[in-house]
């Protein structure tokens, strides 16, 4: 293609998996976010494990999140396509932390 100004954000995911769902998320925000502040906020969230160390090849994978209630989040980076965008990757056990258990968690908060 030879398009030096073409902005692309991508995530590689390998399958098959035994359990747990994963999702690549791109968020568009009204303003640019400081990634260090986003990381710190994610680390403080109950039920979230911020797991992101690309040097040591540690990032969210289905095998890590299987059989637990925590959701692993990582691969946080600026989205090069969306203005004010952030991209991240999440993995969580769909049986332990799926729609039904999330509904129960929300009801408890209310």
Model-derived features with residue positions:
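C-terminal substrate-binding/catalytic lobe of Rossmann-fold NAD(P)-dependent oxidoreductases
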Residues: 1-87
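NAD(P)-dependent Rossmann-like dehydrogenase/reductase catalytic/cofactor-binding core
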Residues: 70-73, 77-110
């Amino acid at each position: 293609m030879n398009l030096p100004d073409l902005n692309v954000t991508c995530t590689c995911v390998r399958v098959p998996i035994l359990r747990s769902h994963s999702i690549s998320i791109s968020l568009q925000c009204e303003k640019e976010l400081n990634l260090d502040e986003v990381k710190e906020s994610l680390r403080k969230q109950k039920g979230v494990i911020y797991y992101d160390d690309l040097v040591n090849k540690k990032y969210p994978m289905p095998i890590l999140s299987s059989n637990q209630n925590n959701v692993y989040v990582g691969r946080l980076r600026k989205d090069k396509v969306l203005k004010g965008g952030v991209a991240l990757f999440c993995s969580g056990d769909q049986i332990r932390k799926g729609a039904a258990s999330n509904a129960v968690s929300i009801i408890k908060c209310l």
